[in-house]
């Protein structure tokens, strides 16, 4: 177990605050780089001759690579230096975010933005685990709320900065400019002190060997993904060359093949993980002795923990709704409210920054305050915020008066962002500490692949055919559904927290079969 920060002397607490501030700033910067493209949609479409569907798939490329990469990076963070993983991730995302500004066509922009997702994944998995160890117990939701404030703040700030910088210097300079700070801050992350934790069981060389990355074993491990991607690529080629299909259908065929392959890989992992007695040893020196077992162990933990299942499914629905809304909001505002790109992104940035910051931090404090009376506090805040904010967002999308739009947007965004801090804290609450980063990696993988990776291109596709004013209504509806699913977890979280606590103190704890 990691050392409990509040029990340490004052200077160590202060250092924990410094680490939290640095990691929160970088999380914000990660989302700035992620969402800057949504403030640049009209000039990019004009310059590179793209459609809304293309933009949706470019955004989805980031999400897909982020989702696929965050799981193994979560494992690596549990086994090796989290600060090294986080720092390397910052460098990678900054490099490819900069290169994206040099794109000359759809595929270069698609691939560079996908690579940004790999770096962001490495940082996200390692940084969330570090924050959770610096601030355990009742302070965890507040700390993760501060860390997660980068999601709404960075998201809307990226859109706002993109629009303003584009108006001054063009979309290419805007995209490259927001990448530069990451290079400078990566060095500070590399020098962070990692909270005390169990000694690593593997060297880096052993880690790669245990992953069985030889050609033969790699093929055996990922054959569903290879087949799915190959079939998707073949279908895209046939559509384009033989039937003259549009490039949006080509990309959709390829992405569908990749998605089916990823689903097949998940099924393969679950089937290989199945044991006759349904148990696993959670002791550091037990069966968790290689990275592949760690991944399988995380999947098994999720499948056998009711609250985690609700968190995963609810999180995917919320990711579908929230990230889709943030991504397509500037385009919606430009086309339905008659605003220029600069005006829309500035308005979104100003009010989104205020409401998102207040909502995320308030959610963490409220969840921890309720935690003094009931262990259900984090799940309650997460679900109720969505159930209030979702209907407000539906009303918002029907408004065409800017004087009404702004206050409704601010209130809706406040309630929708209450979810950010408590939900990650809830994942750590019901996941064994030994594999905490791995479970969070699995959570991020699932919610993005099943959430905004689908929402972003789907809304773009529907927008090209029916208009953004109609297509966008599916997004808040998904967020409401996510709130309902999370509310189911209110009934199970106490039992699952008690089981994790008992398992942690046992000599040879095992996962129970429900």
Where are these regions (language model features)?
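Juxtamembrane intracellular "pre-TM" segments in multi-pass secondary transporters
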Residues: 5-12, 196-238, 264-311, 336, ...
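Extracytoplasmic gate region of multi-pass secondary transporters
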Residues: 37-38, 227-257, 306-353, 360, ...
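Helix-breaking motifs and short loop linkers at transmembrane-helix boundaries and internal kinks
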Residues: 49, 81, 102-108, 119, ...
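Conserved MFS/SLC helix-loop-helix module at the cytosolic interface between two early adjacent transmembrane helices
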Residues: 68-107
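Cytoplasmic membrane-interface "Motif A"-like loop-to-helix N-cap segments
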Residues: 79-90, 368-385
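Cytoplasmic helix-loop-helix junction between adjacent transmembrane helices
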Residues: 112-150
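Helix-loop-helix hairpin linking two adjacent transmembrane segments in secondary transporters
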Residues: 147-197, 211-264
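C-terminal transmembrane helical hairpin of 12-TM major facilitator-type secondary transporters
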Residues: 375-423
């Amino acid at each position: 177990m990691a050392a409990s920060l509040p029990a340490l002397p004052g200077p160590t607490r202060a250092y924990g605050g410094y680490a939290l501030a640095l990691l929160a700033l970088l999380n914000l910067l990660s989302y700035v780089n992620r969402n800057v493209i949504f403030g640049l949609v009209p000039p990019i479409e004009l310059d590179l001759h793209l459609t809304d569907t293309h933009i949706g798939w470019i955004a989805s490329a980031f999400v897909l690579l982020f989702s696929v990469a965050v799981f193994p990076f979560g494992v690596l963070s549990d086994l090796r230096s989290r600060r090294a993983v986080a720092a390397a991730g910052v460098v990678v995302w900054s490099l490819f975010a900069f290169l994206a500004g040099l794109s000359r066509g759809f595929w270069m922009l698609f691939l560079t933005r996908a690579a940004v997702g790999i770096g962001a994944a490495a940082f996200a998995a390692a940084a969330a685990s570090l924050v959770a160890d610096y601030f355990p117990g009742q302070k965890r939701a507040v700390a993760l709320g501060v860390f997660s404030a980068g999601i709404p703040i960075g998201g809307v700030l990226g859109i706002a900065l993109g629009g303003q910088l584009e108006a001054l210097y063009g979309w290419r300079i805007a995209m490259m400019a927001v990448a530069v700070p990451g290079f400078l801050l990566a060095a500070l992350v590399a020098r962070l002190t990692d909270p005390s934790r169990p000694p690593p069981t593997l060297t880096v060389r052993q880690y790669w060997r245990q992953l069985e990355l030889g050609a033969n074993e790699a093929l055996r491990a990922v054959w569903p993904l290879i087949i799915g991607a190959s079939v998707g690529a073949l279908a895209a080629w046939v559509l384009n060359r033989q039937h003259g299909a549009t490039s949006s259908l080509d990309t959709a065929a390829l992405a569908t093949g990749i998605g089916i392959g990823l689903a097949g890989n998940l099924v393969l992992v679950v089937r290989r993980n199945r044991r006759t007695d349904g148990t696993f040893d959670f002791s550091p020196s037990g069966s968790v002795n290689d990275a592949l077992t760690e991944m399988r162990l995380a999947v098994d933990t999720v499948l056998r923990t009711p609250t985690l299942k609700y968190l995963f499914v609810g999180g995917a629905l919320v990711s579908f709704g929230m990230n889709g809304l943030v991504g397509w909001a500037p385009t919606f505002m430009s086309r339905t409210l008659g605003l220029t790109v600069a005006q829309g992104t500035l308005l979104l940035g100003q009010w989104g920054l205020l409401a998102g910051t207040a909502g995320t931090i308030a959610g963490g404090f409220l969840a921890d305050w309720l935690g003094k009376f009931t262990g259900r506090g984090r799940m309650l805040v997460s679900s109720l915020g969505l159930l209030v904010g979702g209907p407000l967002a539906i009303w918002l999308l029907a408004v065409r008066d800017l004087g009404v739009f702004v206050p409704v947007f601010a209130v809706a965004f406040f309630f929708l962002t209450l979810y950010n801090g408590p939900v990650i804290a809830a994942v750590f609450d019901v996941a064994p500490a030994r594999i905490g980063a791995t479970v969070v990696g699995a959570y991020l993988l699932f919610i993005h692949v099943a959430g905004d990776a689908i929402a972003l291109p789907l809304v773009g596709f529907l927008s090209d055919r029916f208009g953004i004013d109609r297509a966008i209504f599916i997004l808040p509806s998904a967020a409401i559904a996510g709130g309902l699913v999370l509310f189911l977890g209110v009934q199970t979280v106490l039992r699952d927290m008690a089981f994790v606590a008992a398992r942690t103190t046992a000599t040879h704890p095992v996962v129970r079969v429900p």
